[in-house]
Amino acid sequence: MTDTNHSSMRQHSLQSLAIAAIGVVFGDIGTSPLYSLKEAFSPAHGIPLTPSAILGVISLLFWAIILVVGIKYVLFVMRADNNGEGGVLALMALSLRPLNPKSRITGLMMALGIFGACMFYGDAVITPAISVMSAVEGLEVATPQLSHLVLPITIVILIALFWIQRHGTATVGKLFGPIMVIWFVTIAALGVYHIARAPMIVSAINPYYAFSFMSEHVLLAYVVLGSVVLVLTGAEALYADMGHFGAKPIRLAAYVLVMPSLVLNYFGQGALLLLDPKAIENPFFLLAPQWAALPLVVLSTVATVIASQAVISGAYSLTSQAIQLGYVPRMKILHTSELAIGQIYVPVVNWLLLFVILCIVIGFKSSDNLAAAYGIAVTATMVITTILAAVVMVKVWNWNKLLVAMIIGVFLVIDLGFFGANLLKVEQGGWLPLGIGALLFFLLMTWYKGRHIVKERTAADGIPLAPFLQGLLAHPPHRVSGTAIYLTGNDTLVPVSLLHNLKHNKVLHERTIFMTFVTRDIPYVKDDERVTVHDAGEGLYIVKAEYGFNETPDVKAVLEEVSCQRAMTFELMDTSFFLARETVVPTHLPGMSIWRERVFAWMHQNAAKPTDFFAIPANRVVELGTKIEI
C-alpha cells in the first residue's frame, strides 16, 4: 500500500473519530447556547440591554471560549494525559506519581483530585435537568398553548433516558455524532443569518468591549461572570473523554466545527438583541423563524438528551475509576456491549442520579431558576484541574518553574474569577452542587481512610505468607482433590480464609492458588504484563493480577492466563473460591472518630459482594467470617 493510501486512511479515521467525539464530548458545551446569554441578562442582575452592554457581554463570552476552551484545555491541559487517559482522577494519579507518598503535598493533591471528582457528580445532576428543561421550554415560543406541559414532558424524557441505560446505548450511539454535527451546523446558520442583519455585533471580537463593560458596571459585571461561565459547561469533557477518542480528533472537532459554531450562535443572539432587546425572553429560540421553531425544539431536545447521555456515561466511568483506585466501595458494574469495553452500566449510580435529577426538576421548576446552581461545580473543577496540571508541568515534565508560574497564573486568575463570581450565587442555588460535592467528598475520604485503617490492622495481625508456606510444606495437612482459590488483598500475608479453613476443616486442596488484584495508577495494563505466577511448590501458586484504573478485574480471564503460563486447565464450576467476609467493628482505637467509623462500617456492609464484582459463580464460593476492629 502506498504512503498516499496510508495517509488517506489515517485522515479518514481521524475524521470519523472527530465526528464520533462531537456526539459524546461536545454535547454539554454545545447545548449551552440554549440558556447562557439569557441567564447573563437575567433581570436579577440588573444589566441594561443597551448596545454597549450587549457588545460587552458577547465579548466576554467570546474571550471566555477562546481562552478557556481553545487555549487552556485544548492546547495545554490535554497534553497532561495519563497514558492517553484524561479526567480529574487520571490527572490526580499522574500528579501523585513523582511525589513522596507521605508528604503533605501528596495528601493535598489527592484531596483536590477527589473533590474535583465529587464536583463532577454535582454537575452531573444539573446538566440533564437544565439541558432537557431548557430545550422543552422552547415550546413556550413555538406553541405557547403547550407551555403548561414543559415540566411533565421534561420528567417523562428524563425517566425514559435513565430507563434505557441498562440496555446500553451502543446502537443509537452511532447516530449521536451525525446528529450533533447537524445541531452545530444549525446553530451556526441561525447565528450567521442574524449577524448579517446586524453586523455591528462582530466588533465584540475586540476585547475592548469586554474591559469597557467590566469597568463601567464593576460589581454587576462581576456577577454577570457567574453566568458567562455557563458557556464553558462541558469544557472539562474535552479532557475527561480524551481516552475514548484521542487528543487529535477532539482538537480537530473543537477548532473546525464546535468553537466556530458556538461563537457564531452567540454573536447571532447578540445581533438579535441589538435589533430587538425584547428577544431576551428566549434569544436562542427566537433566532429561528416561526415555521422553524417547533423543529428546532425537537432538534434541541434530541441534542440535550445526547448531552445528558454523555454526562451519565461519564458518571459511570468515573465511578468505575474511583472503585479501582480505592475511593468508592465495590458496586455492581454491568458491561452493556461485547465490543466496546467502555460501555458500562452502574445500577446504583443510575437510579440515584435519576432520583436527584427529578427532585431538582420538580423543585426548581424552570431552567432560569436552575441556572444559578450550575456554574459553581464547573468552575471548582476548572480550578482543581489547573492546580493539578501545574504539578504535572513542574514535577513530571520538568518545565521551567517561572514559565509554569506565568502560564498557570493567567489561567488561575480566569478560573478563580469565574469561581468567585459563582460563589455569589450560593444562596440562589449554588448550595446544591456544593452540598452534593461536600457530602460525596466526606463519604469518599471516609471510605479511603477506613480501608487504609483496615489494611493496617490486617497487616499488624497478619502472618507472612512465605515462611508460613514453608512450614505448611514441611508439615503438610491432608490434601483433597480439586482447586481452591483464595482471594486476598495482600499477596505477602496468609489469607484469613485459609487460616479458618485449616483450623476448621484441616485440609488443603491439591492445587491451591492465592490470587491478588492490584490497581496501578495507569488506565490500562498491557496483557503481557497483567498476570504473574509464582510457583511455591507442591501445587501452591501465588498469582498477582494487575489492572489499570479504567479496567474491571476479571477472575475468569486471569485463570485463562494462568492456564497459558503454567499449562494448567481450570473448570470454573469445579473450582472453590474462598473469601473472607470482613465485619468491621467501630471502636475507640486511634484512626477515625467513632461516628465516621460507623459510617465506614455501613458503607462496608452495603458494598457489592465480591462474587458480584468479580463475576464469580455464587455456588462456588465459600465465605469465612472475620471481625476487624477499627
From Swiss-Prot:
This protein's encoding gene: kup
GO (cellular component) term, any one: plasma membrane
Q: Does the keyword Transcription regulation apply?
A: no
Transmembrane segments annotated in the record for this chain: 17-37, 51-71, 105-125, 144-164, 175-195, 218-238, 255-275, 283-303, 344-364, 374-394, 402-422, 428-448
Protein name, per record: Probable potassium transport system protein Kup
Q: How does it sit in the membrane?
A: Multi-pass membrane protein
Gene Ontology MF terms in the entry: potassium ion transmembrane transporter activity; symporter activity
Q: Which organism is it from?
A: Burkholderia thailandensis (strain ATCC 700388 / DSM 13276 / CCUG 48851 / CIP 106301 / E264)
* Role noted for this protein: Transport of potassium into the cell. Likely operates as a K(+):H(+) symporter.
Q: What is its main location?
A: membrane
Q: Kindly list the organism's lineage.
A: Bacteria, Pseudomonadati, Pseudomonadota, Betaproteobacteria, Burkholderiales
